[in-house]
Design a protein with these regions (language model features):
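N-terminal and secondary-structure boundary signal
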Residues: 1-240
Length: 240
């Protein structure tokens, strides 16, 4: 983003002011540390593994954090608590009907700041909705979430896994041109940072269109040809 007076706190101040009448969501994932050897998630104490902004944001007044043990979100603004409610019941990283999936239903936008679609967790959610094979572990992990009253809630959760590509999301970049060509995403600047602004509904519809004839093409194909989306008729997703 370049040199910003006040650093990360200034960025958060601007975002929270802009979204004061809307809903601001930041990922506060803990998948990097949660696993077979570390299975208790305390949403108050546990740092996120996805950068400084989420960790500062989750501690701010008025911000609430979902209770998902590996893929939590922090929320601020209108309907924040309602939006993240119930995530402690989910048994996959991006369960259909969960916080990630519902972005497409609330006209949500996703801003990828200085990163590519390899960090676009929403696409994991699309794959879960479409029930793409070979994306989750067969055996679930037993996690415990510390609830607001101090009790511990047990959940058995499957995690992201593919035997061919251990880092599934690294191949999401193969969809980049499809998203640009169909208008589901556009390049923007946030400060000096090159960013990708995505329409959640558009990302869902384009990904579904491409995966329908070949559900595993993101991993099995070296690249995805434009012919796979040239007949797509959805959108427009951005009106300004």
């Amino acid at each position: 983003m370049g040199n910003i007076e006040g650093g990360a706190d200034t960025v958060l101040d601007a975002l929270m002011d802009y979204f004061s009448q809307g809903l601001l969501l930041l990922p506060t994932h803990t998948w990097a540390q949660m696993g077979e050897e570390y299975r208790v998630f305390d949403p108050v104490k546990e740092d996120a593994c996805v950068g400084i902004l989420p960790n500062l944001f989750r501690k701010r007044p008025g911000v609430c954090r979902s209770l998902h043990p590996t893929h939590s979100m922090a929320a601020y603004g209108a309907g924040a608590e309602e939006y993240i409610a119930g995530e402690e019941e989910n048994n996959t990283p991006c369960t259909p009907g969960g916080c990630y999936d519902r972005l497409k239903d609330i006209n949500g936008r996703i801003l990828l700041v200085g990163v590519t679609h390899a960090r676009n967790t929403f696409i994991h959610g699309v794959e879960e909705v479409l029930n793409i094979p070979n994306r989750l572990t067969e055996k679930p992990v037993e996690f415990y979430t510390v609830m607001p009253d101090g009790s511990r809630k047990k959940i058995f959760m499957r995690r992201h896994y593919n035997a061919v590509q251990p880092y599934i999301s690294e191949d999401f970049v193969k969809l980049t041109q499809a998203f640009y060509d169909t208008g589901a995403a556009r390049q923007v600047l946030f400060g000096n940072a090159e960013c990708i602004l995505c329409d959640a509904r558009g990302i869902f519809e384009v990904t579904r269109h491409i995966l329908a004839p070949d559900p595993e093409c993101i991993i099995t194909s070296p690249e995805i040809p434009a012919s796979r989306w040239s007949d797509f008729t959805g959108g427009p997703y951005f009106h300004v």
